[in-house]
């Protein structure tokens, strides 16, 4: 680039920044001619409005519908159940937690696919002497699953822990086996080898997966199922109670929890925090730059209501803050109302509930445990944390 051209570029860039700083328009294009439709978003939203769902909930024949819909969801997401449990390729620990020395933390690196290892961290109390109920923890789109056991790795982690993000540690204190699964794209599973990465941590994975007929949500659900395969195998060092395998997920972890529970009936209770809303409402109100929801053809077959209906009759709680800017509480209510006929078909209408929390998009430990005790695990009765 010659000097005069470079100067023109710098000048126009500086003027553009100045206009932006002063709150002035920066769109260089003229007003769109009257009567024209130039928005790709409006085009796609219009085509979605009247699209019939080929696998919409059919409560009149719920068993047949769940069988067919679960198979179709697996195909759409690229979810494939493993035929054998994963193997341990490395172990880190055990080490006592500084804030809870009677709880040991051990990370197992599980070979879940030929070129994919999954960090699964177990938290176990020293008094564990019988098959343990499982609290499987999926963090949100934050720094990683280490929040589950109360560790900080980046500055903002202190704020997250101050409002109760260490839900797996809290569960372990209450008698569960805490199982912290690192999600694809975050923490130790963040992409570090792709030569030229995009700014968002998961968009490359989502697009590459879509090109292979897979999806980020499918990969996450497969990792959850592989973790359960291992927990139920003889390789797991702690016996578990297969009738009390539960999942807690927040934000992107909550979305993954919903899909995992819809696809894997071994999950016997799910609490999805800050993550329940109809996908059509999400794409109608905001961009999806991380590719988390990229499941090609989803709206031809499903809506979020149907995903929740696949969880029936197993307990489900959708919890959200009344001021959540992504997953507002009224959106939780609509999705759960849409799934309620499935629960009624099983005479289990009391097993699904929308729970409102007082603020915005964040963890809610107290409200989560109240709903957990009431809906997810009636056998949970320990009100006081213990080490």
Regions found by a protein language model. Give the residues of each.
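C-terminal catalytic histidine-bearing segment of alpha/beta-hydrolase fold enzymes
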Residues: 4, 337-387
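Proline/glycine-enriched tight loop/beta-turn segments at coil->beta junctions
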Residues: 115-118, 126-134, 141-144
